[in-house]
């Protein structure tokens, strides 16, 4: 089974935080997923956020014949490009964003993954893309791990039908 690992970010939040969570989530799912197709050869960050990368991501995921797409929202996410990729590929979709930290004393945030997930869900519904999600928890939380494993089992069933 091949999983398209498509971590996403947004420009107005911390790139460093997005890169940190991209790596941390990948380390956890590598132990679970049979085969991961990532974006490391698409751009220098290995993250989806630029409109210009959408055709390259779609082409790569088709060429690799992924069975599902996993979109971790590493700092917020870019709902428009996520929606375009998901709609083009028509495979099971999983959304997840790590639990957000408390805002700094000045009210600023490095990330707002939960809000990004709401925005992405709305765009996916607009594109008639069926999706599921894992609750905002830390990537090493058993809720994330069991949710990811359940998604893989569903993908296996869909693949055999």
Give the ranges of each region predicted by the language model.
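An N-terminal assembly and electron-transfer interface module characteristic of large anaerobic redox
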Residues: 1-161
């Amino acid at each position: 089974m091949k999983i398209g690992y498509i971590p996403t970010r947004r420009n107005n939040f911390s790139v460093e935080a997005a890169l940190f969570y991209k790596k941390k989530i990948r380390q956890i799912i590598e132990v679970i997923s049979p085969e991961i197709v990532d974006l490391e050869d698409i751009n220098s960050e290995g993250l989806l956020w630029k409109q210009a990368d959408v055709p390259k991501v779609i082409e790569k995921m088709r060429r690799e014949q992924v069975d599902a797409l996993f979109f971790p929202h590493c700092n917020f996410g870019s709902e428009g490009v996520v929606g375009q990729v998901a709609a083009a590929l028509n495979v099971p979709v999983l959304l997840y964003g790590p639990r957000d930290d408390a805002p700094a004393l000045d009210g600023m945030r490095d990330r707002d993954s939960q809000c990004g997930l709401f925005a992405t869900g709305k765009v996916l519904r607009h594109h008639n893309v069926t999706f599921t999600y894992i609750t905002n928890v830390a990537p090493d939380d058993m809720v994330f791990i069991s949710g990811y494993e359940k998604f893989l089992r569903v993908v296996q069933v869909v693949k055999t039908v």
